[in-house]
Amino acid sequence: MEVWTLKSLRWKIAIIIVGFILVTGTVLGGVNYFSARSILEDEIYNRQTQVALLLVQGIEDKLTQYQRILATMAEVAEIEAMDWDTAAPYLEEKILALKDFEIFYLVFPDNEFIGTEGNSGNLGDRAYIQETWSRQKGIISEPIISKATNVPVVAITAPIRDAEGTMIGILGGTLTLDFLTEMALDIAEGQAGYPYIIDDSGLVIAHPDASIRFQANFLNTEADYVTPELAAMTQQMVAGEQGLATYSLEGEEYLCSFAPMPLTG
């Protein structure tokens, strides 16, 4: 079975995660901010750091697990045959068993693909497909919009090889980004406030409110929901800074601890 080394896996995850920031926010409500900050600052900062590290490790473990699964699947006879009628029953069984995956698909040498949702098309313009061919190794993509379902996903690939070891195709699978939010909420369960994740453009990737994910950008100062304080804090975040800040949103004041948490450490 062909798998990545930890170094190369972390490098790819860093591309996906680089600029993602875990934020833990605590509502101050009627508590006097200045006294609350002196009491809560260390507690919130330490809690945020712990939650962020747990989340990063959890994401790494999850993606490592799924990359290994895909690499193993790419070596079974049904996939190596590079025939959709042969592969389809096997992949349809796997999609039922592996609930986090949205679809599985085969990519042929001309970059045409067929997926378990009955979808097809050409993925030649996708950077992660090009990189899989050029490196002849599995890839984890940055967050993208799925051509098959039009929802935000992360794609995982594994090379398909013939008996001589020549790469003849690609096995791909897409994960919806819901697992990021679910993992963040599970790790933060029982704590005051909630975590969310943004990318290095300010776009919200994971958030308890599903309507915000991939819709809200906290650098978009023209949006009603982005206050000057929130935009300023987000600027610090995407610059890779770490610290504490306050902002008001919908009548509530939040004390936030934030830090960049790329998986490379």
Predicted regions: what they are:
Residues 141, 157, 174, 258-260:
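Sensory input modules used in signal transduction
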Residues 1-6, 139, 143:
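N-terminal sensory and localization modules of signal-transduction and trafficking proteins
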Residues 46-53, 59-143, 149, 187:
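Extracytoplasmic/periplasmic sensory segments of membrane signal-transduction proteins
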Residues 166, 171-173:
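Sensory beta-strand/linker motifs that couple input domains to effectors
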Residues 162-163, 179-264:
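Intrinsic low-complexity, intrinsically disordered coil/linker regions enriched in small/polar
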Residues 3-38:
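Extreme N-terminal signal-anchor transmembrane helix of membrane signaling/transducer proteins, especially
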Residues 148, 173-183:
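Helix-start (N-cap) segments at beta->loop->alpha junctions
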